């Protein structure tokens, strides 16, 4: 929640020194590092939409979902404040707002990007046919690709907490609902797709 949005804020403050590729890599590499570091401890969801997907898949209960989301939002808020303190208000702490194609473009891009993100996470993290040790690379690589290619549309957030922290710190709430509704809807659609993908052979799920 610090490295990715922070890189977006630094890019604005430095007149584009980081670049879109640099921003995408910042997001992807930090996600990869967090999964490698904390995946075996808590699952390293770091994303309310992913936690909702695991809840819908009955991998976590309501109490754990609430705890995960609360921790994710608290961490994002602290990261947003830290970005403002270090970089200043220029760049709005990396806040996400609809850009190139308005609210409609933001909604559909966030829904579709999060659908594929959640599908990747669910398959590599829970399906016994997948190589679990590669989860961090698969997920981090996808995030880097999505953030690089689709960031200019609406931020390529794919993560309500990632959008919440900067919005709170910079007080930028423009169409903020998009960054909750679309990612969660995309994640739930990914759960449905995951069930369809598994149904023909119904392999054991990884615990």
Pin down the residues of each PLM region.
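Membrane-interface helix-loop junctions and terminal tails of multi-pass membrane proteins
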Residues: 1-207
């Amino acid at each position: 929640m610090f490295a990715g949005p922070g890189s977006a804020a630094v890019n604005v403050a430095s007149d584009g020194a980081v670049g879109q590729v640099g921003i995408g890599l910042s997001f992807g590499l930090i996600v990869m590092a967090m999964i490698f570091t904390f995946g075996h401890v808590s699952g390293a969801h770091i994303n309310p939409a992913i936690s909702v997907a695991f809840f819908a898949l009955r991998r976590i209960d309501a109490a754990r979902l609430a705890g995960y989301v609360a921790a994710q939002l608290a961490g994002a808020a602290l990261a947003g404040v830290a970005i403002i303190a270090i970089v200043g208000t220029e760049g709005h702490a990396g806040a996400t707002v609809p850009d190139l194609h308005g609210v409609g473009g933001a909604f559909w891009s966030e829904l579709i990007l999060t659908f594929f993100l959640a599908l990747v996470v669910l398959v590599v993290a829970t399906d016994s046919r997948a190589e679990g040790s590669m989860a961090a690379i698969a997920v981090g690589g996808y995030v880097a690709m999505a953030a690089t290619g689709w960031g200019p549309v609406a931020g390529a957030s794919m993560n309500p907490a990632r959008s919440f922290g900067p919005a709170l710190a910079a007080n930028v709430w423009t169409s903020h609902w998009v960054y909750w509704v679309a990612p969660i809807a995309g994640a739930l659609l990914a759960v449905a797709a995951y069930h369809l993908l598994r149904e023909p052979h119904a392999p054991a799920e990884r615990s």
